């Protein structure tokens, strides 16, 4: 069994297949921004084969291709956008400056942040409507992923509290909803106030 599929052992495959099938139908453009992480590249290889979304890797193409070659990972057909050399850098620098104008971020500071961290570039692509979603956190801290999302995308209108949730699937179907739990919020607001819960 491959490393990517081994984590599915014991999981409710019907639940996962529903998610996969929805992905195959909608063909959303999903960004992954950890080109140095073998696990991310293996996941992309699996995604390319299964067609559950249109993956795009953000980061250094040479680094990604080097890791892929060394580990025997096939990334054929994958679009890789270099956040340091992208033709759209000016667009995203301007967008970041606009999003962070209350902090008086200038173009030089914005460029340093965006070229220094692919997660920020990916979040700006989502904010601009150039992608449907972004996935990170395999090797990037929750803090950095959340910061990029909050700074670049922000919460929905009339929402102040940003939160996270996790799906946990257990082999014991007598627990939760047929063995499936949704946990919120272990990553961002683990001890919410009543107002934060209401938000």
Placement of each model-derived feature along the sequence:
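Serine residues within intrinsically disordered or low-complexity segments
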Residues: 2-6
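Anion-binding alpha/beta catalytic cores of soluble intermediary-metabolism enzymes, centered on
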Residues: 7-199
């Amino acid at each position: 069994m491959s490393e990517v599929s081994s984590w599915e052992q014991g999981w409710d495959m019907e639940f996962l297949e529903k998610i996969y099938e929805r992905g195959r139908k909608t063909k959303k453009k999903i960004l992954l921004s950890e080109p140095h992480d073998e696990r991310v590249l293996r996941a992309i290889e699996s995604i390319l084969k299964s067609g559950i979304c249109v993956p795009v890797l953000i980061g250094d193409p040479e680094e990604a291709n080097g890791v892929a070659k060394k580990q025997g990972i096939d990334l054929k057909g994958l679009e890789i956008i270099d956040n340091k050399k992208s033709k759209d850098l000016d667009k995203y620098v301007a967008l970041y400056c606009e999003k962070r104008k209350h902090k008086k971020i200038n173009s030089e500071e914005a460029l340093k942040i965006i070229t220094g961290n692919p997660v920020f570039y990916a979040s700006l692509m989502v904010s601009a409507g150039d992608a449907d979603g972004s996935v990170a956190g395999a090797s990037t801290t929750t803090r950095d992923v959340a910061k990029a999302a909050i700074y670049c995308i922000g919460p929905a209108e009339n929402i102040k509290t940003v939160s996270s949730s996790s799906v946990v699937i257990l082999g014991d179907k007598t627990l939760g909803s047929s063995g499936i739990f949704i946990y919120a919020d272990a990553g961002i607001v683990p001890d919410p106030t009543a107002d934060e819960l209401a938000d």
